[in-house]
Swiss-Prot record:
Listed GO MF terms: DNA binding; DNA-directed DNA polymerase activity; metal ion binding; RNA-directed DNA polymerase activity; RNA-DNA hybrid ribonuclease activity
UniProt-annotated stretches for the region Terminal protein domain (TP): 1-177
Protein's UniProt name: Protein P
Taxon lineage: Viruses, Riboviria, Pararnavirae, Artverviricota, Revtraviricetes
Region (Spacer): 178-345
Functional description taken from the UniProt entry: Multifunctional enzyme that converts the viral RNA genome into dsDNA in viral cytoplasmic capsids. This enzyme displays a DNA polymerase activity that can copy either DNA or RNA templates, and a ribonuclease H (RNase H) activity that cleaves the RNA strand of RNA-DNA heteroduplexes in a partially processive 3'- to 5'-endonucleasic mode. Neo-synthesized pregenomic RNA (pgRNA) are encapsidated together with the P protein, and reverse-transcribed inside the nucleocapsid.
Gene3D superfamilies reported in the protein's UniProt record: 3.30.70.270
Note: Hepadnaviral virions contain probably just one P protein molecule per particle.
E.C. designation(s): 2.7.7.7, 2.7.7.49, 3.1.26.4
């Protein structure tokens, strides 16, 4: 008969009527008992032939595709004009005096941030916007393009103009090398005297693979073709005299044909070959329309007219317009032809827009390195969208980048630090990631974009194939007309108006600020905010400022004090160029909500919504049905978060961990489920540790244990020899139960680490409950007063050590009040084990 829940609780010593601990506890280390209990509770799984359950409540397998819901009415969030001051270190020094080495190093990391992937894989532009919502393809396309456009306008993205240049909005940094008159025209006043145009430009620039006529032409008259590369400074200076009137597809060597007259004759042959050439940069003059074609190789190629003053006579050259504007002159093919839509407006605006600033960038191909799509901003805000960027190529495969590790405060450190009687408020940094500037050298690796509406629709619709597109004949133009597209565009026309034209063009953008989809970004953000908080803490030594990623909290003794601190800190952060969202400032009173915990003077507990999730999970948890191990990962993730607040802690979840590790299904027996249910029904706060002097010591040998409690010594023997770690753990449990002390000295590193998951399962669960809230101090064996009793010698007394205990705040570098001068090295080595210094959650 399976083990009843009551009996199981008695075995685990969770009920009062258990016998003396010295007899009962060693029994739990017995392998035979652990095996029998595991069999009774169905914890060691036979290979089950019953089909696995792949969904429990809201938990599906880790790799399942939960289909995100598309919202046609998503609003694109607005981004403030974020510009972090470049001399942020000087500004901080004016505020607080000289910065420490640590703070400077962290701030220098993000001014500017750099990104060096091992290798970068380039993807075709068609993959730029992921077809995540097959029923809302067109709507999603325009919403995403609008989001990208918004980011570009806010100075968060660069727009690739040519292979070697990009434009952006917002204020430039000193490391962004501006291109003055070299690659861009300043308007009609300089048309005659325009400097050499970047002709290898355009959206899809490739090395020329011109037609035979054109290549013969070039070889005979112009000498060898010069390579496509931007002008270096010296050439650029001299290039003023060269009139690059006609945008020839390949660059001519300097000095040949300085005027535009001679090659007017060969425009015809050249325009034929142009169709195969890399595109000429569109819209140097936005008032001229451009035309998009699909060359035989499937690349969109765009042309624009040349102003009459810049070349011979324009009449000899065919006039092309862009894909969108071509509909204006064509006959409607049906009631749902795009011609009807395009004729609604006289002026559809420019084909492209350029930023205020143009900079030179490393060679950037006309490709992307990651796809984008939209999702809800967060579970509580489904009205606004959030852009998801998939740069996962940098985290995969043999060339993956191993991102730097950084310290995340664990629960005990957090409680030691923040559990106090302070008043709290938390600040909301708006678009925190987009504060940190990236060096332009990273642009070629972090590219997003889209191939333009015509190709996007053609790729996704089954009836229209991109076949005979290079001649741009009428049927091909109307291939994309369909009722769905027409209806979608008509609805979108209400939202976006003439922007539909701009958004239907192809575009490539690179990140100017750190994107969220790269593993480097969380590290950089954590470094940045922790450095800023360190500065704030030194400026206001009587207060506490603390951050984890973009979550910044301030604490002060009284509410009035907190408000004045809030004003000062807000002004300081704004002076650095950090944007706060005042509507989202939360005042917590004395119990702070932070990182999923509620932290008050009594300690920490999980937030209410997590407790509700756990209750919900247990309500839906099936009994006696094998659950897919991927679903178990989800369940363990949730239960593991709240495990430190339960009686038995992490050890209670060990059977689940074991099944995940062996990739087996797990079956909950009624007793095990009831045990976990009861565990998570009553949560106990994790209290802050107090400093103190250690008076109680424990030690053990495989055969016996010994305690030193003040001047009293005790010893005992085990029924059978035990592994040394198990014996030491038992001795610590006896010390706690006999003395009630919350501070125990031990010489065993495993006991110190307070991870009881590697012990026999029943013992781990019971020991976790007995030792809950106990702090350990490391004492070397040679100095341990309990060493002699554990070896059976009671007569010999070692003097009691005065071992002070100082609670750790972890390696989160939060509270280390930064000294103004570096401190000298310690005189002597202290015996703090590494396990002790870096506290793990209890």
């Amino acid at each position: 008969m399976p083990l009843s829940y009551q009996h199981f609780r008695r075995i685990l010593l969770l009920d009062e009527e258990a016998g003396p601990l010295e007899e009962e506890l060693p029994r739990l280390a017995d392998e035979d008992l652990n095996r029998r209990v595991a069999e009774d509770l169905n914890l060691q799984l036979p290979n089950v032939s019953i089909p696995w359950t792949h969904k429990v409540g809201n938990f599906t397998g880790l790799y399942s595709s939960t289909i995100p819901v598309f919202n046609p009415n998503w609003k694109t969030p607005s981004f403030p004009d974020i510009h972090l001051h470049q001399d942020i270190i000087n500004k901080c020094e004016q505020f607080v005096g000289p910065l420490t080495v640590n703070e400077k190093r962290r701030l220098n990391l993000v001014m500017p941030a750099r990104f060096f992937p091992i290798s970068t894989k380039y993807l075709p532009l068609e993959k730029g916007i992921k077809p995540y919502y097959p029923d809302n393809v067109v709507n999603h396309y325009f919403q995403t393009r609008h989001y990208l456009h918004t980011l570009w306008k806010a100075g968060i993205l660069y727009k690739r103009e040519t292979t070697r240049s990009a434009s952006f909005c917002g204020s430039p940094y000193s490391w962004e090398q501006e291109l003055h008159h070299g690659a861009f025209l300043d308007g009609p006043s300089r048309m005659g005297e325009e400097s050499f145009h970047h002709q290898s430009s355009g959206i899809f620039s490739r090395p020329p693979v011109g037609s035979s006529i054109q290549s013969k032409h070039q070889k005979s008259r112009l000498g060898p073709q010069s390579q496509q590369r931007p002008l270096d400074g010296s050439q650029q200076g001299r290039s003023g005299s060269i009139r690059a009137g006609v945008h020839s597809p390949t660059r001519r060597p300097f000095g040949v044909e300085p005027s535009g007259s001679r090659h007017a004759k060969n425009i015809a042959s050249r325009s034929a070959s142009c169709l195969h050439q890399s595109a000429v940069r569109k819209a140097a003059y936005p008032n001229h329309s451009t035309f998009e074609r699909h060359s035989s190789s499937g690349h969109a190629v765009e042309f624009h007219n040349i102003s009459p003053s810049s070349a011979g006579s324009q009449s000899k050259r065919p006039v092309f317009s862009c894909w969108w504007l071509q509909f204006r002159n064509s006959e409607p093919c049906s009631d749902y032809c795009l011609t009807h839509l395009v004729n609604l407006l006289e002026d559809w605006g420019p084909c492209t827009e350029h930023g205020k600033h143009h900079i030179r960038i490393p060679r950037t191909p006309a490709r992307i390195t990651g796809g984008v799509f939209l999702v809800d901003k967060n579970p509580h805000n489904t009205a606004e969208s959030r852009l998801v960027v998939d740069f996962s190529q940098f985290s995969r495969g043999s060339s993956r980048v191993s991102w730097p590790k950084f310290a995340v405060p664990n629960l005990q450190s957090l409680t030691n630090l923040l559990s106090s009687n302070l008043s709290w408020l938390s600040l909301d940094v708006s678009a925190a990631f987009y504060h940190l500037p990236l060096h332009p050298a990273a642009m070629p690796h972090l590219l997003v974009g889209s191939s333009g509406l015509s190709r996007y629709v053609a790729r996704l619709s089954s009836n229209s194939r991109i076949i005979n597109h290079q001649y741009g004949t009428l049927p091909n133009l109307h291939d994309s007309c369909s009722r769905n597209l027409y209806v979608s565009l008509m609805l979108l026309f209400k939202t976006f108006g003439r922007k539909l034209h701009l958004y239907s063009h192809p575009i490539i953008m690179g990140f100017r600020k750190i994107p969220m989809g790269v593993g480097l970004s969380p590290f950089l953000l954590a470094q940045f905010t922790s450095a800023i908080c360190s500065v704030v803490r030194r400026a206001f030594p009587h207060c506490l400022a603390f951050s984890y990623m973009d979550d910044v909290v301030l604490g002060a003794k009284s509410v009035q004090h907190l408000e004045s601190l809030y004003t000062s800190v807000t002004n300081f952060l704004l002076s650095l160029g950090i944007h706060l969202n005042p509507n989202k400032t939360k005042r917590w009173g004395y119990s702070l909500n932070f990182m999923g915990y509620v932290i008050g003077s009594w300690g920490s507990l999980p937030q209410e919504h997590i407790i509700m999730k756990i209750k919900d999970c247990f309500r839906k948890l099936p009994v006696n049905r094998p659950i897919d191990w991927k679903v178990c990962q989800r369940i363990v993730g949730l239960l593991g978060f709240a495990a430190p607040f339960t009686q038995c802690g992490y050890p209670a979840l060990m059977p689940l961990y074991a099944c995940i590790q062996s990739k087996q299904a797990f079956t909950f027996s009624p007793t095990y489920k009831a045990f976990l249910c009861k565990q998570y029904l009553n949560l106990y706060p994790v209290a802050r540790q107090r400093p103190g002097l250690c008076q109680v010591f424990a030690d053990a040998t495989p055969t016996g244990w010994g305690l030193a409690i003040g001047h009293q010594r005790m010893r005992g023997t085990f029924m059978a020899p035990l592994p040394i770690h198990t014996a030491e753990l038992l001795a610590a449990c006896f010390a706690r139960s006999r003395s009630g002390a919350k501070l125990i000295g031990t010489d065993n590193s495993v006991v110190l680490s307070r991870k009881y998951t590697s012990f026999p399962w029943l013992l781990g669960c019971a020991a976790n409950w007995i030792l809950r809230g106990t702090s350990f101090v490391y004492v070397p064996s040679a100095l341990n007063p309990a060493d002699d009793p554990s070896r059976g010698r009671l007569g010999i007394y070692r003097p009691l050590l005065r071992l002070p205990f100082q609670p750790s705040t972890g390696r989160t570098s939060l509270y280390a009040v930064s000294p103004s001068v570096p401190s000298h090295l310690p005189d002597r080595v202290h015996f703090a084990s590494p396990l002790h210094v870096a506290w793990r959650p209890p």
